[in-house]
Amino acid sequence: SSSLSNTPDIAFFSARLKLPKLFKPCAYKGIPVIRVHVFNRIPVMAMLRLPTKASDGKANLQQGAIGVGIDMATGTTTTAIMGKGQIIEKVPGTELPLSGIKIPYWKQILTMSVEAQSISSLGFLGADIAIDRDHGPVILELNARPGLSIQLANFSGLKERLDRVRGVMIKTTERGVRLGRN
């Protein structure tokens, strides 16, 4: 069929993701998303984005979601912000700490992110990955300009990490993941 402007209509269909039990207490309505920034086939920074009541169940920081930094070596959450930079330590309205959450499938998530960057031919990207209760990690989208709020969530700048891996020759995905975790 065609649209009113006589151009073909396009629709995307995807499976409905099921929320893992781990995230039920800290996600409002929607599915949490792990954003991994990859440069030069090396994952350099990551955050967990949690949907909130303020963001109406969307994992979008600009709309009021929570961004939680992730330790690259362990896949464990560290520091957190809400919205555009308000520092928080607990899930709003609860006593649940945001630090110390162990992200399941961490190595696989990093591997998927590096492989997506290799296939895309983008020098720098943000891979958005959700975890389905039954199927594990699923790539939602790749972002050529993924935004910089990941730095606020991690209380750390990207520039130093990017400079550290610029020009490093990465022949295998495994090596890129290993360097990203060091």
Where in this protein do the model-derived segments appear?
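PAS/PAS-like sensory domains
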Residues: 11, 122-125
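Short, surface-exposed charged micro-motifs
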Residues: 35, 128-130
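Intrinsically disordered, low-complexity Ser/Thr/Pro/Gly-rich regulatory segments
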Residues: 68-98, 109, 113
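Hydrophobic, Leu/Ile/Phe/Ala-enriched alpha-helical segments that form helix-helix packing faces
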Residues: 1-2, 113-120
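Short, positively charged
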Residues: 10-12, 107-110
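Phosphate-binding site of ATP-dependent enzymes
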Residues: 1-82
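C-terminal active-site "lid" helix and adjoining low-complexity regulatory extension at the edge
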Residues: 90-108, 118-122, 131-182
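A short local loop/turn or secondary-structure capping micro-motif enriched for an aromatic residue
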Residues: 52-57, 87-88, 147-150
